[in-house]
Amino acid sequence: MRTILLTIAYDGTDYYGWQIQPDLPTVQGEIEKALHRVTGKEIHINGTGRTDRGVHAYGQCATFRIGDGIPTDRIAYALNNSLPGGIRIVSAEEKPEGFHARFDAKGKTYRYRLLLCGPHEDADGAPQAQRQLLYLRNYVYQVNRPLDLAAMRKAAAAMEGTHDFACFQAAGGEERETTVRTVYRVELTERCLEEGFFPEEESAHVLDIDVTGDGFLYNMVRIMAGTLVDVGSGRIGAADVPAVIESADREKAGHTAPPQGLYLMRVYFEEDFGHGEE
Amino acid sequence: MRTILLTIAYDGTDYYGWQIQPDLPTVQGEIEKALHRVTGKEIHINGTGRTDRGVHAYGQCATFRIGDGIPTDRIAYALNNSLPGGIRIVSAEEKPEGFHARFDAKGKTYRYRLLLCGPHEDADGAPQAQRQLLYLRNYVYQVNRPLDLAAMRKAAAAMEGTHDFACFQAAGGEERETTVRTVYRVELTERCLEEGFFPEEESAHVLDIDVTGDGFLYNMVRIMAGTLVDVGSGRIGAADVPAVIESADREKAGHTAPPQGLYLMRVYFEEDFGHGEE
């Protein structure tokens, strides 16, 4: 038996999240169906992160075991021919026996993407911002208030490090042994989209919040992003963020930013840290 | 009674075209439902063009009649609050009694959008182009062959003017009195997307084919776009396009480009030609 690691990109708009569910389209379900069409076998895959409905990925990972048959270097091509256009296998590689996309993951990077729009009105008083989001509505969290980026960067720095992140955990996830996690980096990058694909991108500003950590609690990145937006709009003081974390109280943190702004960018394994021993 | 002209933008991905159909989501159906929610009345709207399933619009038009009640300058705002995010009312304006979005239209501009990608393979031999189209797959026609733009521009010029365009008409549309139409302009604009919203836009080339005419036969723009792609890839000679039109034979023209690359950009009425007499 070979152990195969898939790297997967997907547009989460049309899926009820990663995890397989009866009678609902999910990313895991579509990939297992495609594996069945390609190999004729029922193959179960283990994903690194169970992304929620509407959340996207550029670098989700999953492992499965497979016997003889399709060569490893044809798996991505064969699956892509069988998968819907919104799910793409970026690569498939063989790993040592027992390698597991979830248990062997050492960390992940998520991106949370904001679209910063001023509150505009057209001649009729109708908010122009509504039109702006026609084509990007499923891929970004639109914020119509001015945001104080310096305050957000200060708050982001306070979120880095090893903390009990219970304040950034939503109810409803799996039970965890501990709510202590290490956030290696929270990086804010703003850029202006000069001439994009859609007219709505013209003169829009994108603010990406890239969060890298060793693990994440349920909805943690979305609550971090919502908290940063609340800091940027003055609802929460940047200087208060350490106390919010200290409190371990979900009520003291900011709102949960919506799923469509979230992208699972990359999963890190032992060898990504440069001291693998395969 | 007031006569109201709506200008409408929509993402056609989730709709079975413009025209209302029982039990299927359509753009006209969603707008009539929203009008009912906003006014409490059953109001029928007349659209300018019956776009097909998957076709988009930035400037579709539609008219309807309405009595007292909601002020004209609040209609767009009220409808947008009631419509799904993929349909946006750009404007609502009062027109003279009897004005009709379809019968008073003097012309339209459609855009057909191609994404030009070289045939790339990654290290595993899997076509990279498949990944590139994850997020733009519903908004563009991806072409992986090199295209001869000079030949396409020559063919485009041959499509301009007043001709019997029966060769560019698909079966299945409404019956028309004549297949003679005037195409005022076919313009090709290529541009490179430097740093777009999605990574797949990086270094992609967009080729827009903008077609303005007094009227269009069923699938005419999609067949014109497919014919131009066939000219660009050498399947049809640019010098043969006048004879293709002359033949009035659908079999001699090129393939029908897929719906997701097509956008209804603008509808022209009498006053847009500068000699209105309202």
Model-derived features: positions:
Chain A
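Structured-RNA-binding interfaces characteristic of tRNA pseudouridine synthases
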Residues: 1-278
